[in-house]
């Protein structure tokens, strides 16, 4: 038995090579599309119309950069048979036909526009045109009279769909269920993304000293991640000193001072797959209150990890975490996200979601192939410090494997005096 997590999930180099099996992207595309179609059957949907960016990438393997993330300016249609169809932002439709010619042509990669989130009003006719094209594609597929799932649409577009006689229902649950079980290729990509953050935490640990700002850490982390191949840094939480309690969920330009406890969360995207990965340090020297807070956070984490295996349920995990009132909050809604578990994949918050807020009443079964993060938070008795830990893990046939490997067994003191 090892005393700390070691690399047991492969994280090969990120280049394409002829001498080693790495990620098979064609296999990845086929797996994801098959998962979506399985859920269309399970949820009795003739098709799903996707506006949410992570869903579009999962189902169609297309993306145009994160400037367009969840702006509603592109959408996709997936039916139980045939090729997905993408309506994209202007010239991006032509680019897809060039980039993936075996998947897209002039019939299923076309331009589309629903008004740029209201910047172009319904009087332009763009909303009505988009829905006419969607309905025509559904009729061509023979499913226009079926239940049609929609994930996250603008109100104006949704109303136009209903006016056109489409039987629109919730499609997001089908997509969430599709995404909850990861393929071996997805697990490699998620592990590679974590390996990048392992390296950034080494840099943060060496960087932490008085005079460095929270925002300086954020800037360095962005540069390092992009240098290693990240395609998008969604967030770097950088929280120090009295800002640790309560958790503000946003960095500032505060100067780090001797004795500060500081915690960080790095959320970035590599080849479409995210990380959510907290670590806590203290600068120069640590008080007993800070060490005690870290110890509590680690104990809650270890108790949760010990329960993770196929057949376990999310309420069993949530029950080992303290109640909101036990660490300074009025109720579970106010404390939500502090003792927390969530799937990680093409989206930041996927199934299963684990917390005392939702899991005690509506537990879900843990399944092999799930990949999720567990997060714990313990405020210190000094009223200002706090410890925050997060581990990502893969559910295996007989337990789980941790893939976030920067040391976290005990409180680490950066640049110790």
Regions of interest found by a model, annotated:
Residues 1-417:
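Active-site neighborhoods and metal-handling regions in enzymes and metal-associated proteins
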């Amino acid at each position: 038995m090892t005393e700390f997590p070691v690399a047991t999930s492969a994280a090969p180099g990120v280049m394409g090579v002829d001498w080693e099996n790495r990620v098979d992207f064609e296999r990845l595309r086929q797996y994801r599309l098959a998962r979506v179609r399985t859920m269309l059957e399970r949820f009795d949907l003739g098709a799903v119309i996707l506006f949410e960016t992570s869903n579009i990438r999962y189902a169609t393997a297309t993306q145009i950069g994160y400037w367009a993330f969840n702006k509603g300016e592109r959408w996709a249609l997936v039916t139980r048979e045939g090729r997905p169809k993408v309506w994209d932002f202007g010239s991006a439709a032509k680019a897809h036909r060039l980039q993936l010619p075996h998947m897209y042509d002039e019939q299923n990669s076309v331009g589309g526009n629903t008004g740029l989130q209201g910047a172009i009003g319904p009087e332009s006719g763009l909303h009505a045109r988009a829905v006419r094209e969607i309905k025509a594609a559904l009729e061509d597929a023979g499913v226009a009279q079926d239940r049609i799932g929609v994930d996250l649409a603008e109100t104006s577009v949704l109303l136009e769909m209903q006016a056109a006689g489409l039987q629109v229902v919730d499609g997001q649950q089908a997509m969430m269920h599709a995404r909850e079980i990861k393929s071996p290729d997805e697990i490699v990509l998620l592990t590679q993304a974590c390996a990048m953050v392992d390296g950034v935490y080494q840099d943060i640990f060496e960087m932490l000293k008085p005079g460095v700002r929270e925002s300086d850490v954020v800037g360095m982390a962005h540069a390092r991640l992009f240098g290693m191949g990240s395609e998008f840094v969604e967030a770097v939480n950088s929280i120090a000193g009295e800002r640790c309690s309560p958790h503000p969920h946003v960095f500032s330009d505060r100067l780090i001072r001797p004795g500060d406890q500081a915690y960080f969360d790095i959320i970035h995207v590599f080849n479409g797959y995210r990380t959510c990965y907290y670590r806590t340090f203290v600068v120069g020297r640590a008080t007993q209150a800070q060490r005690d807070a870290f110890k509590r956070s680690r104990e809650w984490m270890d108790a949760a990890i010990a329960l993770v295996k196929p057949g376990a349920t999310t309420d069993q995990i949530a029950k080992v975490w303290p109640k909101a009132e036990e660490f300074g909050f009025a109720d579970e809604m106010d404390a939500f996200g502090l003792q927390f578990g969530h799937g990680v994949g093409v989206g930041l918050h996927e199934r299963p979601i684990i917390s005392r807020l939702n899991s005690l009443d509506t537990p879900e079964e843990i399944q092999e192939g799930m990949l999720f993060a567990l997060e714990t938070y313990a405020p210190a008795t000094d009223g200002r410090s706090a410890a925050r830990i997060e581990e990502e893990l893969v559910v295996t046939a007989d337990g789980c494997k941790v893939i976030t490997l920067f040391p976290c067994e005990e409180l680490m003191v950066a640049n110790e005096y």
